[in-house]
Amino acid sequence: LLVETLINAGAETLTGKLTVSAEKNGETVTQEVALVQRAERSVNLSAEGTANCYIARTGGVYKFDASVKGNGGGDGVSDYIANYGLAIEDGAFAELLWESRHDGDKTMSREIIDGAPIYRGGYVTFSTGRSEGNAVIAVKDIKGNIVWSWHIWVCNDEITAHDHIDSEGKVAAVIMDRNLGALNNTPMDVGNRGMFYEWGRKDPFTPSRSPYHADTDGNNVPAYNEPNTAIGDGTGTWVYNAQAAVLATPPANIPNSILNPMTYLQSPYNGHADWYCTGTDPKATHPGLWGPEKTIFDPCPPGYKVPGPDLWGIPAGNNSITNGGAAADYDETGVSAKWDWNAYEDCGRRWKNTGDFYPMAGNIYYTDYISVSICNYTGGMAFYWTAQATPDATKSSA
């Protein structure tokens, strides 16, 4: 028996009785059914603005506005909105694509999202379980195609923000106290890694599940880079060897990336080149998918965006990214008067001007000719994106 009612938006539980009658072989049978409808007490994560990522805690009930793409803002110069619009109008149902803990525990990864998400009235409602971690929920159309998807970051910490001091001693930005998707910023803890992103894309990929190793030296040991392919109770599949289509006109591969949020799109050509577009005009080379103003492709939760230019003192157009020197340049505490970054320790480095720790979480890079692992250089390298445009000679979105 399915009884459909409006959501109980009041503060109290509603009760009632339903009488069901049916006739069989000339005999009428009547049955009373007691109805109980609990108050709808979900926390509206989009109350202060929509985004592609929402922060939740364990053991809660949440909802968010799924009627608009991302933050409802711009799309850089990608022409995506002109072709596909901002509104989500053809959603039919919600589905959990994946849920995963940082350690890749496949049993506990099922405890991040509790049950199936529900899509109704332009909102997605979901419950969280007993485990922290990350997940992605999608809204699909009646044919089962993904219309849009959202990153759910389940973390019980109070995530805070503070001033970032640049090389000149000025406040360059107000930044989060950890990586996007991280459970902490504790050195040598796998929970500090956060999520991985292809530049300009809104959907996350999971970093390696391997523990940090103190002897990491950048040699890319496979045992230190075990991929995290857990999906919990999700229905999706991780794909790392897909090649982006050769499309020279914006919005190029953006629709493909939205349809396939769990697919890492390799460049159609060998090397670290764009997944987005193979064209050579400014719209293709500098599309502003992440830009000075938050876009619909920005992966950050409400109140945050991808960092802007010169966050770590590298001016736009400067091909040099040298930010550290020889061991002799540092004192016994790992600090150098010459460099902004302290010496490497505990699989990361600290920004001298604030003391913030930046873990070396590695990267994802998979090709058919270099296949060390899906994850690479965990604990030995770090790659941190900004919205800053790069010179044409070094343009890369992968």
Model regions: which residues?
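Surface-exposed binding patches on compact interaction domains or structured appendages
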Residues: 1-4, 41-125
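Solvent-exposed segments in extracellular or luminal domains encompassing
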Residues: 8-9
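A short beta-strand micro-motif common to beta-rich folds, especially ectodomain repeats
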Residues: 12-25, 132-142
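C-terminal edge beta-strand
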Residues: 29-41, 145-159
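Structured loops at beta-to-helix junctions and adjacent beta-edge loops in soluble globular domains
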Residues: 67, 129, 140, 155, ...
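Surface-exposed interaction regions enriched in Ser/Thr/Asp/Glu
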Residues: 121-149
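Short aromatic-cysteine micro-motif
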Residues: 123, 133-135, 162-322
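C-terminal, surface-exposed recognition/capping segments
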Residues: 182, 260-398
